[in-house]
């Protein structure tokens, strides 16, 4: 678990089609705790929303019919992963994600709806399911079992 106090503020990234809350970045001080791509976001081409040094990369892609992506392989590259970063894709329903600082203190919440995608990049987090929810979770492996996370009671 990371130590220190991380006050959280919500910053809204100003790209998209002018809609409200298109891509949101939740910060713990200067560290990104989460990136949310709202289901209303739309932009032609490829938009990487994560910094290049994140161990989990997330991009939004919108291509026209007939566009081709050149066949390719991904090469074996040794990487070091210090913290698990997970992506949740909300297929159905609504949930609230609560963000916590390094001292297990609640900081802020965000509501996710059908079609939203979130990358949980750092800090503590918990969820309350507001409607029946179906989601897909994607994270790095190999699975580390109980060593992967620390559960806590909010301060």
Feature locations, PLM:
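Short, positively charged low-complexity motifs
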Residues: 4, 8-10
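A short, N-terminal "cap"/entry segment at the start of jelly-roll beta-barrel domains
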Residues: 10-60, 155
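Double-stranded beta-helix
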Residues: 23, 126-155
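Conserved short histidine dyad/triad with adjacent acidic residue
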Residues: 61-82
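Glycine- and acidic-residue-biased ligand/ion/polar-headgroup-sensing regions
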Residues: 64, 83-98
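Short beta-strand His + acidic residue motifs that chelate non-heme Fe in jelly-roll/DSBH
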Residues: 71, 97-98, 118-120, 125-130, ...
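Short acidic-glycine-tyrosine-enriched beta hairpin
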Residues: 101-122
């Amino acid at each position: 678990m990371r130590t220190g106090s991380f006050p959280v503020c919500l910053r809204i990234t100003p790209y998209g089609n002018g809609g409200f809350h298109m891509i949101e970045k939740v910060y713990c001080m200067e560290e990104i705790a989460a990136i949310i791509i709202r289901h209303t976001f739309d932009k032609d081409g490829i938009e990487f929303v994560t910094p290049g040094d994140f161990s989990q990369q997330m991009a939004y892609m919108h291509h026209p019919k007939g566009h081709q992506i050149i066949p390719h392989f991904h090469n074996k590259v040794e990487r070091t992963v210090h913290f698990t970063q997970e992506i949740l894709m909300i297929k159905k329903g609504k949930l609230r994600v609560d963000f916590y600082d390094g001292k297990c203190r609640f900081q802020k919440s965000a509501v996710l709806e059908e079609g939203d995608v979130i990358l949980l990049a750092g800090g503590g987090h918990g969820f309350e399911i507001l409607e029946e929810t179906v989601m897909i979770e994607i994270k790095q492996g190999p699975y580390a079992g109980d060593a992967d996370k620390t559960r806590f009671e909010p301060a």
